Amino acid sequence: MAKKSMIAKQKRPAKFSTREYNRCKICGRPHGYLKKYGICRICFRELAYKGEIPGVRKASW
């Protein structure tokens, strides 16, 4: 989980557009962000295992 101060800092408007970055909507993690889903890879994996993301299932070949 991200610190509350870091989440609050990210919500403020940045002075420059290049300083803006994405955070996971669930845990606030800034790295491993999946743009299509708006969450990080760890939260994506947990939700996919639970079957809460429609159209996503474990691959096997």
Curated annotation (Swiss-Prot):
Keyword Cytoplasm listed: no
Native organism: Finegoldia magna (strain ATCC 29328 / DSM 20472 / WAL 2508) (Peptostreptococcus magnus)
Keywords noted in UniProt: Metal-binding, Ribonucleoprotein, Ribosomal protein, RNA-binding, rRNA-binding, Zinc
Subunit structure, as described in the record: Part of the 30S ribosomal subunit. Contacts proteins S3 and S10.
Extent of the signal sequence: none
Designated gene of the protein: rpsZ
Coiled coil: none
Chain residues that bind Zn(2+): C24, C27, C40, C43
Domain of life: Bacteria
GO cellular component: cytoplasm; small ribosomal subunit
Listed name of the protein: Small ribosomal subunit protein uS14
Gene Ontology BP term (one): translation
The record's free-text note on cofactor binding: Binds 1 zinc ion per subunit.
Family that this chain belongs to: Belongs to the universal ribosomal protein uS14 family. Zinc-binding uS14 subfamily.
Function: Binds 16S rRNA, required for the assembly of 30S particles and may also be responsible for determining the conformation of the 16S rRNA at the A site.
GO molecular function: rRNA binding; structural constituent of ribosome; zinc ion binding
Cofactor: Zn(2+)
Taxonomic path: Bacteria, Bacillati, Bacillota, Tissierellia, Tissierellales
Keyword flag rRNA-binding: yes
Pfam families tied to this protein: Ribosomal_S14 (PF00253)
NCBIfam families in UniProt: PRK08061.1
